[in-house]
Protein backbone atom coordinates (compact mmCIF):
# COMPACT_ATOMS: atom_id res chain seq x y z
CA UNK A 1 0.00 0.00 0.00
CA UNK A 2 1.57 3.23 -1.13
CA UNK A 3 1.67 6.27 1.12
CA UNK A 4 4.21 7.73 3.44
CA UNK A 5 5.98 4.88 5.14
CA UNK A 6 4.68 4.64 8.63
CA UNK A 7 7.17 2.55 10.47
CA UNK A 8 6.41 3.95 13.86
CA UNK A 9 3.40 6.13 13.14
CA UNK A 10 -0.02 5.51 11.71
CA UNK A 11 -1.47 7.89 9.15
CA UNK A 12 -2.20 11.06 11.15
CA UNK A 13 -5.83 11.24 12.17
CA UNK A 14 -7.97 14.26 12.79
CA UNK A 15 -8.81 12.97 16.27
CA UNK A 16 -5.31 13.92 17.45
CA UNK A 17 -5.78 17.53 16.41
CA UNK A 18 -7.66 20.41 17.99
CA UNK A 19 -11.36 20.81 17.17
CA UNK A 20 -11.71 21.07 13.41
CA UNK A 21 -13.63 23.90 11.72
CA UNK A 22 -15.33 21.06 9.84
CA UNK A 23 -17.46 20.35 12.88
CA UNK A 24 -19.00 23.82 12.62
CA UNK A 25 -21.39 23.13 9.76
CA UNK A 26 -23.00 20.65 7.44
CA UNK A 27 -21.14 20.29 4.20
CA UNK A 28 -22.18 17.79 1.58
CA UNK A 29 -19.28 16.68 -0.57
CA UNK A 30 -18.90 15.03 -3.95
CA UNK A 31 -15.21 14.14 -3.99
CA UNK A 32 -11.67 15.38 -3.63
CA UNK A 33 -9.74 17.84 -5.76
CA UNK A 34 -5.96 17.69 -5.80
CA UNK A 35 -3.08 19.52 -7.47
CA UNK A 36 0.16 17.77 -8.33
CA UNK A 37 3.13 18.13 -10.65
CA UNK A 38 1.83 18.10 -14.25
CA UNK A 39 2.40 14.59 -15.64
CA UNK A 40 1.92 12.91 -12.24
CA UNK A 41 -1.89 12.94 -12.26
CA UNK A 42 -2.19 9.13 -12.35
CA UNK A 43 0.06 8.74 -9.31
CA UNK A 44 -1.82 11.46 -7.47
CA UNK A 45 -5.16 9.84 -8.32
CA UNK A 46 -3.91 6.48 -7.08
CA UNK A 47 -2.73 8.09 -3.87
CA UNK A 48 -6.18 9.63 -3.23
CA UNK A 49 -7.87 6.32 -3.97
CA UNK A 50 -5.54 4.51 -1.57
CA UNK A 51 -6.33 6.94 1.24
CA UNK A 52 -10.07 6.72 0.47
CA UNK A 53 -10.02 2.91 0.46
CA UNK A 54 -8.67 2.97 4.02
CA UNK A 55 -11.93 4.72 4.99
CA UNK A 56 -13.98 2.26 2.86
CA UNK A 57 -14.92 5.13 0.55
CA UNK A 58 -14.69 4.56 -3.18
CA UNK A 59 -14.68 6.62 -6.34
CA UNK A 60 -12.94 7.29 -9.63
CA UNK A 61 -10.71 10.03 -10.99
CA UNK A 62 -11.09 12.32 -13.94
CA UNK A 63 -7.65 13.07 -15.23
CA UNK A 64 -6.56 15.48 -17.89
CA UNK A 65 -2.93 14.47 -18.35
CA UNK A 66 -0.49 17.34 -18.08
CA UNK A 67 -2.84 19.66 -16.20
CA UNK A 68 -1.62 18.87 -12.69
CA UNK A 69 -5.25 18.56 -11.56
CA UNK A 70 -7.04 15.45 -10.30
CA UNK A 71 -10.76 15.39 -9.61
CA UNK A 72 -11.60 12.27 -7.64
CA UNK A 73 -15.35 11.81 -7.69
CA UNK A 74 -16.87 9.72 -4.92
CA UNK A 75 -19.26 6.92 -5.86
CA UNK A 76 -19.69 5.24 -2.47
CA UNK A 77 -19.33 6.72 1.00
CA UNK A 78 -18.68 10.25 2.25
CA UNK A 79 -15.65 12.09 0.79
CA UNK A 80 -15.59 14.31 3.86
CA UNK A 81 -14.59 11.24 5.92
CA UNK A 82 -11.61 10.82 3.60
CA UNK A 83 -10.70 14.49 3.59
CA UNK A 84 -10.69 14.56 7.41
CA UNK A 85 -7.98 11.89 7.37
CA UNK A 86 -5.76 13.66 4.86
CA UNK A 87 -2.84 15.80 5.88
CA UNK A 88 -1.44 17.20 2.65
CA UNK A 89 2.13 17.41 3.95
CA UNK A 90 1.99 13.60 4.31
CA UNK A 91 0.81 13.04 0.73
CA UNK A 92 3.51 12.08 -1.74
CA UNK A 93 2.18 13.37 -5.05
CA UNK A 94 -0.63 15.74 -4.04
CA UNK A 95 0.70 19.20 -3.22
CA UNK A 96 -2.79 20.51 -2.48
CA UNK A 97 -6.00 18.67 -1.61
CA UNK A 98 -9.52 20.04 -1.14
CA UNK A 99 -12.84 18.45 -0.39
CA UNK A 100 -14.93 19.09 -3.54
CA UNK A 101 -18.50 20.22 -2.82
CA UNK A 102 -20.03 21.23 -6.16
CA UNK A 103 -19.11 20.76 -9.79
CA UNK A 104 -20.63 23.88 -11.38
CA UNK A 105 -21.18 24.31 -15.10
CA UNK A 106 -21.70 27.95 -16.04
CA UNK A 107 -24.25 28.28 -18.83
CA UNK A 108 -24.43 32.07 -19.00
CA UNK A 109 -20.94 33.55 -18.84
CA UNK A 110 -22.36 37.03 -18.18
CA UNK A 111 -23.32 35.79 -14.69
CA UNK A 112 -20.95 33.36 -13.02
CA UNK A 113 -21.92 34.53 -9.53
CA UNK A 114 -25.54 33.34 -9.27
CA UNK A 115 -24.94 29.62 -10.04
CA UNK A 116 -22.16 29.50 -7.44
CA UNK A 117 -24.30 31.23 -4.78
CA UNK A 118 -27.26 28.96 -5.55
CA UNK A 119 -25.12 25.85 -5.27
CA UNK A 120 -23.57 26.90 -1.97
CA UNK A 121 -26.53 28.59 -0.23
CA UNK A 122 -28.01 25.39 1.31
CA UNK A 123 -24.67 24.22 2.77
CA UNK A 124 -22.44 25.34 5.65
CA UNK A 125 -20.66 28.65 6.04
CA UNK A 126 -17.08 29.59 5.17
CA UNK A 127 -14.51 31.86 6.78
CA UNK A 128 -12.67 33.05 3.68
CA UNK A 129 -12.92 32.92 -0.12
CA UNK A 130 -10.14 32.10 -2.60
CA UNK A 131 -10.79 32.11 -6.32
CA UNK A 132 -7.96 30.44 -8.18
CA UNK A 133 -6.92 28.40 -11.16
CA UNK A 134 -4.23 25.72 -11.05
CA UNK A 135 -4.05 25.68 -14.85
CA UNK A 136 -1.41 27.57 -16.73
CA UNK A 137 -3.20 29.17 -19.65
CA UNK A 138 -0.82 31.07 -21.83
CA UNK A 139 -2.83 34.25 -21.99
CA UNK A 140 -3.46 34.15 -18.25
CA UNK A 141 -7.15 34.58 -18.99
CA UNK A 142 -8.25 32.27 -16.18
CA UNK A 143 -6.05 34.11 -13.70
CA UNK A 144 -7.60 37.37 -14.85
CA UNK A 145 -11.08 35.89 -14.53
CA UNK A 146 -10.34 34.66 -11.00
CA UNK A 147 -9.15 38.12 -10.02
CA UNK A 148 -12.13 39.85 -11.60
CA UNK A 149 -14.63 37.52 -9.92
CA UNK A 150 -13.29 37.91 -6.39
CA UNK A 151 -15.03 41.15 -5.32
CA UNK A 152 -18.54 40.47 -6.75
CA UNK A 153 -18.44 36.80 -5.66
CA UNK A 154 -17.38 37.69 -2.10
CA UNK A 155 -20.12 40.28 -1.80
CA UNK A 156 -22.82 37.93 -3.13
CA UNK A 157 -21.70 35.02 -0.91
CA UNK A 158 -21.65 37.30 2.13
CA UNK A 159 -25.16 38.57 1.39
CA UNK A 160 -26.34 34.97 1.04
CA UNK A 161 -24.83 34.08 4.44
CA UNK A 162 -22.41 31.61 2.84
CA UNK A 163 -19.31 33.64 3.65
CA UNK A 164 -18.64 35.17 7.08
CA UNK A 165 -18.53 38.97 7.32
CA UNK A 166 -14.92 38.91 8.54
CA UNK A 167 -12.17 36.40 7.79
CA UNK A 168 -12.10 33.62 10.39
CA UNK A 169 -10.21 30.36 10.97
CA UNK A 170 -13.16 28.99 12.92
CA UNK A 171 -14.83 28.07 9.63
CA UNK A 172 -13.48 26.18 6.61
CA UNK A 173 -12.15 28.20 3.71
CA UNK A 174 -13.95 28.17 0.38
CA UNK A 175 -11.94 27.65 -2.80
CA UNK A 176 -13.59 28.30 -6.15
CA UNK A 177 -11.38 26.53 -8.64
CA UNK A 178 -11.77 27.79 -12.21
CA UNK A 179 -11.00 24.94 -14.61
CA UNK A 180 -12.34 26.95 -17.54
CA UNK A 181 -14.54 30.01 -18.04
CA UNK A 182 -17.56 27.69 -17.85
CA UNK A 183 -16.43 25.22 -15.23
CA UNK A 184 -15.93 25.98 -11.53
CA UNK A 185 -15.43 23.48 -8.74
CA UNK A 186 -16.43 24.73 -5.28
CA UNK A 187 -14.25 23.11 -2.64
CA UNK A 188 -13.63 23.30 1.06
CA UNK A 189 -10.27 23.55 2.84
CA UNK A 190 -9.07 23.43 6.42
CA UNK A 191 -5.47 23.24 7.62
CA UNK A 192 -3.47 21.08 7.93
CA UNK A 193 -5.63 18.81 5.75
CA UNK A 194 -5.04 21.32 2.93
CA UNK A 195 -1.97 23.41 2.36
CA UNK A 196 -2.07 27.03 3.50
CA UNK A 197 0.17 27.98 0.55
CA UNK A 198 -1.48 29.34 -2.61
CA UNK A 199 -1.83 26.34 -4.97
CA UNK A 200 0.24 24.39 -2.41
CA UNK A 201 3.42 25.94 -3.79
CA UNK A 202 6.10 27.50 -1.57
CA UNK A 203 7.53 30.62 -3.18
CA UNK A 204 11.21 30.51 -2.29
CA UNK A 205 13.72 33.17 -3.24
CA UNK A 206 16.78 31.89 -5.08
CA UNK A 207 19.93 33.43 -3.63
CA UNK A 208 22.55 34.32 -6.22
CA UNK A 209 25.41 33.01 -4.12
CA UNK A 210 23.88 29.49 -4.17
CA UNK A 211 25.91 27.26 -6.53
CA UNK A 212 22.82 25.67 -8.13
CA UNK A 213 19.04 25.86 -8.21
CA UNK A 214 19.00 22.52 -6.35
CA UNK A 215 19.49 24.63 -3.23
CA UNK A 216 15.78 25.46 -3.52
CA UNK A 217 14.95 21.76 -3.44
CA UNK A 218 16.64 21.10 -0.10
CA UNK A 219 15.26 24.34 1.36
CA UNK A 220 11.75 23.31 0.34
CA UNK A 221 12.27 19.83 1.82
CA UNK A 222 13.18 21.24 5.24
CA UNK A 223 10.38 23.79 5.04
CA UNK A 224 7.55 21.50 4.00
CA UNK A 225 8.47 18.05 5.31
CA UNK A 226 8.98 19.17 8.91
CA UNK A 227 7.01 21.39 11.25
CA UNK A 228 8.94 24.41 12.61
CA UNK A 229 9.45 22.63 15.96
CA UNK A 230 10.67 19.45 14.25
CA UNK A 231 12.99 21.46 12.02
CA UNK A 232 14.51 23.24 14.98
CA UNK A 233 15.09 19.86 16.64
CA UNK A 234 16.74 18.06 13.72
CA UNK A 235 18.70 20.87 12.04
CA UNK A 236 21.10 22.68 14.35
CA UNK A 237 24.28 24.71 14.19
CA UNK A 238 27.38 22.66 14.96
CA UNK A 239 26.05 19.45 13.39
CA UNK A 240 28.06 17.45 10.86
CA UNK A 241 26.81 16.13 7.57
CA UNK A 242 27.82 14.39 4.36
CA UNK A 243 26.53 15.33 0.90
CA UNK A 244 26.79 12.48 -1.63
CA UNK A 245 26.82 13.66 -5.24
CA UNK A 246 27.38 17.20 -4.00
CA UNK A 247 28.62 19.08 -7.08
CA UNK A 248 28.27 21.91 -7.88
CA UNK A 249 27.22 22.34 -4.26
CA UNK A 250 23.66 23.67 -3.81
CA UNK A 251 22.78 21.22 -1.04
CA UNK A 252 26.14 21.56 0.69
CA UNK A 253 25.79 25.35 0.52
CA UNK A 254 22.31 25.21 2.07
CA UNK A 255 23.44 22.96 4.93
CA UNK A 256 26.40 25.25 5.60
CA UNK A 257 24.05 28.26 5.78
CA UNK A 258 22.26 26.33 8.54
CA UNK A 259 25.51 25.99 10.48
CA UNK A 260 26.22 22.35 9.55
CA UNK A 261 29.84 21.34 8.78
CA UNK A 262 29.73 19.37 5.54
CA UNK A 263 31.78 16.76 3.73
CA UNK A 264 30.99 17.05 0.02
CA UNK A 265 31.55 13.84 -1.96
CA UNK A 266 31.64 13.92 -5.77
CA UNK A 267 34.08 13.27 -8.59
CA UNK A 268 32.71 16.44 -10.16
CA UNK A 269 33.86 19.96 -9.33
CA UNK A 270 32.49 21.86 -6.36
CA UNK A 271 31.95 25.63 -6.59
CA UNK A 272 35.21 27.47 -5.78
CA UNK A 273 33.72 29.48 -2.86
CA UNK A 274 32.61 26.24 -1.21
CA UNK A 275 36.04 24.65 -1.72
CA UNK A 276 37.51 27.60 0.18
CA UNK A 277 34.89 27.49 2.96
CA UNK A 278 36.36 26.11 6.22
CA UNK A 279 32.97 24.47 6.96
CA UNK A 280 33.35 22.28 3.85
CA UNK A 281 35.61 19.28 3.23
CA UNK A 282 35.69 18.10 -0.36
CA UNK A 283 36.26 14.40 -1.07
CA UNK A 284 36.61 13.15 -4.63
CA UNK A 285 35.06 9.70 -4.29
CA UNK A 286 32.19 7.49 -5.34
CA UNK A 287 29.12 8.39 -3.27
CA UNK A 288 28.02 4.76 -3.15
CA UNK A 289 31.35 3.67 -1.70
CA UNK A 290 32.27 6.54 0.66
CA UNK A 291 31.93 5.79 4.40
CA UNK A 292 32.20 8.37 7.19
CA UNK A 293 34.98 7.94 9.75
CA UNK A 294 32.52 8.59 12.57
CA UNK A 295 28.76 8.98 12.87
CA UNK A 296 27.28 12.18 11.43
CA UNK A 297 23.98 13.94 12.02
CA UNK A 298 22.98 14.13 8.35
CA UNK A 299 23.56 12.34 5.10
CA UNK A 300 22.01 14.01 2.06
CA UNK A 301 22.13 12.53 -1.43
CA UNK A 302 21.06 13.91 -4.81
CA UNK A 303 22.84 11.43 -7.10
CA UNK A 304 21.02 10.66 -10.34
CA UNK A 305 20.98 6.86 -10.39
CA UNK A 306 18.60 3.93 -10.07
CA UNK A 307 16.26 4.59 -7.12
CA UNK A 308 16.81 1.11 -5.66
CA UNK A 309 20.56 1.69 -5.61
CA UNK A 310 20.19 4.97 -3.76
CA UNK A 311 17.69 3.44 -1.35
CA UNK A 312 20.02 0.53 -0.50
CA UNK A 313 22.89 2.90 0.18
CA UNK A 314 20.75 5.15 2.34
CA UNK A 315 19.57 2.06 4.23
CA UNK A 316 23.27 1.19 4.80
CA UNK A 317 23.87 4.62 6.30
CA UNK A 318 20.89 4.33 8.65
CA UNK A 319 21.24 0.65 9.55
CA UNK A 320 25.02 0.77 10.19
CA UNK A 321 24.41 3.83 12.37
CA UNK A 322 26.57 6.13 10.26
CA UNK A 323 23.92 8.88 10.47
CA UNK A 324 20.89 9.96 12.50
CA UNK A 325 18.99 11.59 9.63
CA UNK A 326 18.94 11.06 5.88
CA UNK A 327 17.48 13.24 3.14
CA UNK A 328 17.66 11.96 -0.41
CA UNK A 329 16.04 11.97 -3.79
CA UNK A 330 14.76 8.95 -5.66
CA UNK A 331 14.85 9.60 -9.39
CA UNK A 332 11.78 7.94 -10.85
CA UNK A 333 11.58 6.00 -14.09
CA UNK A 334 9.21 7.19 -16.83
CA UNK A 335 6.76 4.35 -16.20
CA UNK A 336 5.77 2.37 -13.09
CA UNK A 337 6.73 5.34 -10.95
CA UNK A 338 4.30 4.47 -8.18
CA UNK A 339 5.52 0.85 -8.11
CA UNK A 340 9.10 2.04 -7.88
CA UNK A 341 8.39 4.33 -4.93
CA UNK A 342 6.41 1.62 -3.22
CA UNK A 343 9.12 -1.00 -3.74
CA UNK A 344 11.83 1.34 -2.47
CA UNK A 345 9.89 2.29 0.65
CA UNK A 346 9.09 -1.32 1.37
CA UNK A 347 12.74 -2.25 1.06
CA UNK A 348 13.82 0.58 3.35
CA UNK A 349 11.23 -0.51 5.87
CA UNK A 350 12.49 -4.11 5.74
CA UNK A 351 16.09 -3.02 6.20
CA UNK A 352 15.30 -0.71 9.12
CA UNK A 353 13.07 -3.22 10.87
CA UNK A 354 15.69 -5.93 10.26
CA UNK A 355 18.30 -3.74 11.93
CA UNK A 356 15.83 -2.99 14.77
CA UNK A 357 15.92 0.72 14.03
CA UNK A 358 12.87 2.82 14.86
CA UNK A 359 12.33 5.46 12.25
CA UNK A 360 9.94 7.88 10.71
CA UNK A 361 10.08 8.08 6.93
CA UNK A 362 8.42 10.87 4.97
CA UNK A 363 8.17 11.06 1.21
CA UNK A 364 7.11 13.99 -0.94
CA UNK A 365 7.31 15.14 -4.49
CA UNK A 366 8.31 18.72 -3.87
CA UNK A 367 7.45 21.63 -6.13
CA UNK A 368 11.15 21.90 -7.02
CA UNK A 369 11.44 18.15 -7.67
CA UNK A 370 11.20 17.01 -11.26
CA UNK A 371 10.94 13.28 -12.10
CA UNK A 372 11.78 12.40 -8.52
CA UNK A 373 10.54 12.27 -4.96
CA UNK A 374 12.33 13.39 -1.83
CA UNK A 375 12.67 11.05 1.15
CA UNK A 376 13.37 12.12 4.72
CA UNK A 377 14.30 9.39 7.21
CA UNK A 378 14.48 10.33 10.87
CA UNK A 379 15.81 8.12 13.67
CA UNK A 380 17.16 8.58 17.19
CA UNK A 381 15.87 11.06 19.75
CA UNK A 382 13.54 12.66 17.22
CA UNK A 383 11.14 9.77 17.74
CA UNK A 384 10.96 10.16 21.51
CA UNK A 385 10.95 13.98 21.34
CA UNK A 386 7.93 13.93 19.05
CA UNK A 387 6.33 10.80 20.57
CA UNK A 388 6.38 8.77 17.39
CA UNK A 389 6.41 5.40 19.21
C1 LIG B 1 21.93 16.45 -9.58
S1 LIG B 1 23.63 16.65 -9.33
C2 LIG B 1 23.70 17.16 -7.66
C3 LIG B 1 23.39 18.59 -7.47
C4 LIG B 1 23.68 19.04 -6.06
N1 LIG B 1 22.78 18.41 -5.11
C5 LIG B 1 23.57 20.54 -5.93
O1 LIG B 1 22.77 20.98 -5.12
O2 LIG B 1 24.33 21.26 -6.59
C6 LIG B 1 24.19 15.01 -9.22
C7 LIG B 1 25.66 14.88 -8.89
O3 LIG B 1 25.90 13.53 -8.57
C8 LIG B 1 27.21 13.22 -9.00
N2 LIG B 1 27.33 11.77 -9.06
C9 LIG B 1 26.76 10.90 -9.93
N3 LIG B 1 27.12 9.64 -9.61
C10 LIG B 1 27.90 9.73 -8.51
C11 LIG B 1 28.56 8.79 -7.70
N4 LIG B 1 28.45 7.47 -7.93
N5 LIG B 1 29.28 9.24 -6.66
C12 LIG B 1 29.39 10.56 -6.40
N6 LIG B 1 28.78 11.50 -7.13
C13 LIG B 1 28.04 11.09 -8.18
C14 LIG B 1 27.37 13.95 -10.31
O4 LIG B 1 28.75 14.18 -10.55
C15 LIG B 1 26.60 15.24 -10.03
O5 LIG B 1 27.48 16.24 -9.61
UniProtKB/Swiss-Prot annotation:
* Pfam families noted in UniProt: FtsJ, RlmM_FDX, RLMM_N
Which reaction(s) does the protein catalyse, per the Swiss-Prot or TrEMBL entry? cytidine(2498) in 23S rRNA + S-adenosyl-L-methionine = 2'-O-methylcytidine(2498) in 23S rRNA + S-adenosyl-L-homocysteine + H(+)
Q: Where in the cell is it found?
A: Cytoplasm
- InterPro entries named among the record's database cross-references: RlmM_FDX, RlmM_THUMP-like, RNA_MeTrfase_FtsJ_dom, rRNA_MeTrfase_M, SAM-dependent_MTases_sf
Q: Composition bias, kind Polar residues: at what positions? A: 1-13
HAMAP family recorded: 23SrRNA_methyltr_M
Subunit composition and interactions: Monomer.
Per the similarity annotation, which family is this? Belongs to the class I-like SAM-binding methyltransferase superfamily. RNA methyltransferase RlmE family. RlmM subfamily.
- Described function: Catalyzes the 2'-O-methylation at nucleotide C2498 in 23S rRNA.
- Which protein, by its recorded name, is this? Ribosomal RNA large subunit methyltransferase M
From which organism does this entry originate? Hahella chejuensis (strain KCTC 2396)
Amino acid sequence: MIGNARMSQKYPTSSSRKRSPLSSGKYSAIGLLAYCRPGFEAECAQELQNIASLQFVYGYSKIDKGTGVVFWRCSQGNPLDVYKEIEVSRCIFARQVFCALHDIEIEDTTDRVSPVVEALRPGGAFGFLHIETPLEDEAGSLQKLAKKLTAPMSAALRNAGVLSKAKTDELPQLHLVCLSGQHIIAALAVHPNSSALPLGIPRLRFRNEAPSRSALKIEEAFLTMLTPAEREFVLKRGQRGVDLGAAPGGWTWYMVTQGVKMTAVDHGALQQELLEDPAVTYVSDDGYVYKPQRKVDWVVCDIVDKPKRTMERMADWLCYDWTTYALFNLKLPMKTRMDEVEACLQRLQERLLGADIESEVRVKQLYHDREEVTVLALTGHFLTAFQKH
